[in-house]
Amino acid sequence: MKNSSIILVLVFFFFISSSGEAKTCSDGWTCVGEDKCKVNCMAKHKGVGTCTLYIIPSFPAPITSYICDCMFDC
């Protein structure tokens, strides 16, 4: 009985501690400047925005675009 009580307490503690973690979500839009990306991300989601260059392979030339990657807690 004593061992099962300890296991029950440990399982309960693990469940409570893991349920409180924030998940990370993301949003993205066309980047019009690093500073504007950071400001818009903070205003929309209270997150951190970074301009990232994405290269999409295509023929005859690859397509490149800058996207504002906004990472925030859900």
From Swiss-Prot:
Location relative to the cell: Secreted
Query: Primary place of residence?
Result: secreted
Family per record: Belongs to the DEFL family.
**Transmembrane segment boundaries:** none
- Name under which the protein is recorded: Putative defensin-like protein 186
Say yes or no: keyword Coiled coil present: no
Give start-end of the signal peptide: 1-22
**Mind listing the GO biological process terms from this record?**
defense response to fungus; killing of cells of another organism
Ordered alphabetically, the record's keywords are: Antimicrobial, Disulfide bond, Fungicide, Plant defense, Secreted, Signal
Q: List the disulfide bonds.
A: 25-74, 31-51, 37-68, 41-70
Instruction: From the UniProt record, report the name of the gene that encodes this protein.
Output: LCR40
